[in-house]
Design a protein with these regions (language model features):
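RNA-contacting regions in translation and RNA-metabolism proteins
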Residues: 1-205
Length: 205
């Protein structure tokens, strides 16, 4: 059986870049890594409805620069940027370092795999027929400009006694081609029957 590899990690240095960009000596490396995880966790918890596909972190000396990619920049910025300033201060308390925040707008959320996975999870949580949900989401992504999409949902679909896997594929999704711009996202849907895992692969070109 073929071994599974994370599509983003597999392409770092080819079509993808590191989500954390900094250098550290042996003594500080683990501390910085844990700090990055705390920052990401905090952002996703506080802004869970802001449609954030990814958070990138850069460090230069003591300064920590956080790039937040979002489909809803208005939710993050607030009136006259007050929300961003409040949030930056919270992150400075969390890290004990000066923090600079940059909000980057995502213009086509239908082509961001993690946002598509979250949309599917939300629909499955409302007990919508999974086949209909997958087809609708796939059609929207293809219409937005995606070359191909693959969706996999697993768990007790439609409240079935035994868990099973539902798949939907449209267009080309070359997982083994390194130069292919492939985006990957995962989300968990919570239903009365239990948790359902949603995985999405989107081929952008």
């Amino acid at each position: 059986m073929g071994q599974k590899v994370h599509p983003t990690g597999f392409r770092i240095g080819v079509t993808e870049q590191w989500r954390s960009r900094w250098y550290a000596n042996k003594k500080d490396f683990a501390k910085n890594l844990v700090e990055d995880q705390k920052i990401r966790k905090f952002i996703r918890k506080e802004w869970q409805f802001a449609a954030i596909p990814k958070v990138e972190i850069e460090r230069t000396g003591e300064l920590v620069t956080v790039f937040v990619h979002t489909a809803r920049p208005g939710v993050l910025i607030g009136k006259k940027g007050t929300k961003v300033d409040e949030f930056r201060m919270e992150l400075e308390k969390l890290t004990g370092k000066p923090v600079r925040m940059k909000i980057i707008e995502v213009h086509r959320p239908e082509m961001e795999a993690s946002l598509v996975a979250e949309a599917i999870a939300e629909q499955l949580g409302k007990r919508i027929n999974y086949r209909r949900a997958l087809k609708k989401v796939a059609d929207t992504s293809i219409a937005a400009g995606a070359k191909g999409i693959k969706i996999r949902v697993a768990g007790r679909l439609q409240g079935a006694e035994m868990s099973r896997v539902g798949m939907f594929r449209k267009g080309r999704v070359p997982c083994g081609t390194l130069r292919a711009q492939l985006d990957y996202g995962f989300a968990t849907a919570v239903t009365k029957s239990g948790a359902l895992g949603c995985k999405v692969w989107i081929f952008k070109g």
